[in-house]
Amino acid sequence: MPSTPTLIFIIIFYLVSLASMLQNGFMMIVLGREWMRNRTLPAADMIVASLASSRFCLHGIAILANLLASFDFCYQANLIGILWDFTNTLIFWLTAWLAIFYCVKISSFSHPVLFWLKWRISQLVPRLLVVSLIIGGLSAVISATGNFMANQMTISQGFHGNCTFGHMSLDFYRYYYLYHSVLMWFTPFFLFLVSVIVLMFSLYQHVEKMRGHRPGPWDLHTQAHTMALKSLTFFFIFYIFFFLALVISSTKRKSMQSYYWAREAIIYTGIFLNSIILLFSNPKLRKALKMRF
């Protein structure tokens, strides 16, 4: 029987995951219907729809993997873990492309590269989505290779017991997984970081200029840009929060008790909060939500 704190984190993890699946499922349905009705979607909505679909799958995979690991279905849990790596890497790259897209479209900096991208990035989005799938597939191959090697080592050492301890008790697997995480996650995270910082700085400059020309506190344009800046700031904070929790969890020995469930609750709460901001910052999704409720 798990301790009370562990039980609380388990409940938080499952509730947050189910709520996030409902939320991302709603986003998928709204944007999917528009995609089918118009046979096309704006470039930004295309990325958002892909991101919502990936997050929906990630939460489902996490629930299934944890249930399998809890009942010591080691082989099945490891197979699901490979699919998790694919989906998680895909989410990192989709988030990076979304940040770059908004940075290019909204920022007011007059750099030749930004001008060139402003006219072409919408046409590049389908290709970027394909690139994300390819990188996700590469991540899955690397993960599958590491799992196979760890399985052989575990068998050769005659390990028996909880499958969650099996792989992560091996120094080889923990370092292998850490290097894999650095290779697959840090590049899109860095692109996201730079894009959001540039966009936030550009929005801040724009808000200050508008306040100087329109000193009225209730100016609608200033309010809209201020709200966008606040939403972006919260998205930025929650995403860093999620990323750090994920990296820390990749360097620690996993346990089905104690800290494992705390890390799971923190990581998936971060994804859930990011999805909330994404939902309310999209006019189409916000309108659809108001019509439903």
From Swiss-Prot:
Keyword Heme: no
Lineage: superkingdom: Eukaryota
TM annotation in the entry: 7-27, 56-76, 80-100, 128-148, 182-202, 228-248, 265-285
GO biological process terms held by the UniProt record: detection of chemical stimulus involved in sensory perception of bitter taste
Broad class of where this protein is predominantly found: membrane
Membrane topology: Multi-pass membrane protein
Disulfide bonds: none
Matching Gene3D superfamilies: Rhodopsin 7-helix transmembrane proteins
One MF annotation (Gene Ontology) recorded for this entry: G protein-coupled receptor activity
Record keywords: G-protein coupled receptor, Glycoprotein, Membrane, Receptor, Sensory transduction, Taste, Transducer, Transmembrane, Transmembrane helix
Residue spans, topological domain Cytoplasmic: 28-55, 101-127, 203-227, 286-293
Pfam family, one: TAS2R
GO cellular component: membrane
The keyword Cell division appears for this protein: no
Protein family (similarity comment): Belongs to the G-protein coupled receptor T2R family.
Miscellaneous note of the record: Several bitter taste receptors are expressed in a single taste receptor cell.
Function summary: Putative taste receptor which may play a role in the perception of bitterness.
Protein name, per record: Taste receptor type 2 member 143
Originating gene: Tas2r143
